[in-house]
């Protein structure tokens, strides 16, 4: 069997890997694991990834669980164009520099609006207003750092061409954008960066990858989202409790 990718396009890192694979013609068997239903906490999936996280890549007996590691693995295995993960040592270090910062400052911050507006209400939990306000402040600060430190006067986050850094960043920022946050308003450099990345990826691929998250507010309003499993319910309560 070929490579299998376990994912849910509601998940930002799942979308990053999906887009990368599609853009580069990498053959993958897609296995959808419904996060809202809690399928990532099922016994069957935990046998594949005991962390219960998405995305997860299975290449024969080899299982890989972190999106940045998966992207690097696929880039090297399929020898994708050099701009994604440069062979030049310093250019590659810039990609890693961003990915390290991304894990600390972006990854846990920009996903919170989904918990506030969709996932919390789905299980009858309201995130306190002061936590929502702190999250907005944290997002604004992270956007400023993203713009000043990583983008600067360059066209892309790690240099003159699109890299894995841009893909990871775009997908994370799309999460609150899909929920109505005007992240790029008043930030012309970031808005132009987004336009360049999306133009490179192509409108059709972006629409394909983003269609589920872009419709999630409508699904929540119409009450058409699935009911989380008991295992997922407990995990969701714990995740909401960890919102700073």
UniProtKB/Swiss-Prot annotation:
InterPro entries xrefs: Glutathione-S-Trfase_C-like, Glutathione-S-Trfase_C_sf, Glutathione_S-Trfase, Glutathione_S-Trfase_N, GST_C, GST_C_Theta, GST_N_Theta, GST_Theta
GO annotation terms (biological process): glutathione metabolic process
Major localization listed first in the record, in broad terms: cytoplasm
Record's catalysed reaction(s): RX + glutathione = an S-substituted glutathione + a halide anion + H(+)
Tissue expression from the record: Expressed at low levels in liver. In lung, expressed at low levels in ciliated bronchiolar cells, alveolar macrophages and alveolar type II cells.
GST N-terminal domain ranges (all copies): 2-82
Subcellular location: Cytoplasm, Cytosol; Nucleus
Enzyme Commission number, as recorded: 2.5.1.18
UniProt keyword terms in alphabetical order: Cytoplasm, Nucleus, Transferase
Transmembrane segments: none
Binding locations of glutathione: 40-41, 53-54, 66-67, 104-107
CDD domains: GST_C_Theta, GST_N_Theta
GO cellular component, as recorded: cytoplasm; cytosol; extracellular exosome; nucleus
GST C-terminal domain ranges (all copies): 88-224
Gene Ontology MF: a single term: glutathione transferase activity
Assembly with partners or alone: Homodimer.
Physiological role: Conjugation of reduced glutathione to a wide number of exogenous and endogenous hydrophobic electrophiles. Has a sulfatase activity.
PANTHER family noted in UniProt: GLUTATHIONE S-TRANSFERASE THETA-2-RELATED, PTHR43917
Family: Belongs to the GST superfamily. Theta family.
Protein name: Glutathione S-transferase theta-2
Annotated source species: Homo sapiens
